[in-house]
Amino acid sequence: GELMIDLFNRLGYDAWTLGNHDFDWGPEKLDALLDRSASPVLTANIERGGARPGGFDGAWKRVLPWTMKDVGGFRIAVIGLITPGLPFWLPPDLLGGTEATDPAAALAAAVKEARSARADAVVVTGHMGWRFNDDYANPVRSILRDVDGVDVYLAGHSHQNQPSWTLHDVLCSQASYHGIHCGRIDLTFDMDSRKLVDRRAFTILMDDRFEPDPAVMA
């Protein structure tokens, strides 16, 4: 996992979201990766020892439910969610006391905070993918049905290239896996009212049109 964190740092990621495979090497390794990250780690729906994101100590202080970014003068809230499937794949010794909580409830609370902080748009990065029907690990349909105030959902986990679709009036996108595609979201605002007036999503195939970065390749 160290290589991926170093890559995130080099690319200047604003934030990233925990997924189930971040727990594969156990709690000590995950602590080291969190320490290594230069950016916050957004995961609203977890608990550790009764504490929630924003209230953790040690390396886990970097884990927050959401963050606010200024993009072109507009306030974009970014909220992270992890799949609730963690206990189905990972034994307690690897989870190290981390529990996945109800993603819809955690998201609703984070959206309320973000909107109270005058977010002009709310983007959710979820380690859950879209399928024709919800399942225990990917309840995206029900989450977006039950929680108001989300403008964009960036999906993961299900390893599919899904450039753009709309679900319960939320623009959704997933940029495949392993860096095969890069995702892009364009948000258009009215300059006077600051209202979001257009949303578009794309995925871009990372083929030989793009020169490899020598430092990354090394």
Q: Each predicted region: which residue ranges?
A:
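Acidic, metal/ion-coordinating pockets
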Residues: 1-215
